[in-house]
Regions:
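Conserved "landmark" site that anchors the functional core of diverse proteins
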Residues: 1-156
Length: 158
């Protein structure tokens, strides 16, 4: 599955369970702020519970679907629109090439998690694909999404 960012929202990042066990070296655990929501979003699309997700903060992205797949949004205060139509919360949604996804804030929440079906093609550091900022520098380029970026995943074969 492939999704292209038309807009990225305020701060949309790649997050997983972070980097536990490295704080003695000065590396914060990081990862998704709401791990339960992250795991549930992954469960809805059939991914491993610890798989990366998109963490949306305050305002969500507008995504153009380049390939078919499934997505699920978990988090209060956000609505998922598919081609302009509101989708039911907490359910997997099938998308097709050409579809438009918009994650819209209702103003009542801070974060939401969009899981995307498949195996992520993401750079990892200390076992994690989570975005990590040190000062003003992003440690994993590509973990913070911007306009024009393409998220690419492979099908998971069981």
């Amino acid at each position: 599955m492939k999704l292209q960012f038309v807009t990225s929202g305020l701060r949309t990042t790649t997050q997983d369970l972070g980097r536990p066990g490295h704080t003695h070296m000065g590396v914060p655990t990081g990862g998704a702020l709401d791990r339960s929501a992250m795991r549930y979003a992954n469960h809805l699309v059939g991914n491993a519970l610890a798989a990366p997700v998109l963490e949306v903060t305050l305002s969500g992205p507008h995504l153009h679907c380049l390939e078919a797949g499934r997505v699920a949004l978990v988090g209060s205060g956000f609505d998922l629109l598919l081609n302009g139509e509101p989708q039911p919360p907490l359910l997997p949604i099938s998308v097709n090439p050409g579809d438009e996804l918009i994650i819209k804030s209702s103003g009542n929440g801070c974060r939401a998690y969009l899981s995307v079906s498949g195996q992520w093609h993401a750079e990892r550091w200390l076992g994690s694909a989570s975005a990590l900022r040190i000062g003003s520098h992003e440690l994993l380029p590509g973990a913070v999404w911007t306009r024009g970026d393409v998220l690419e995943l492979s099908l998971i074969h069981i």
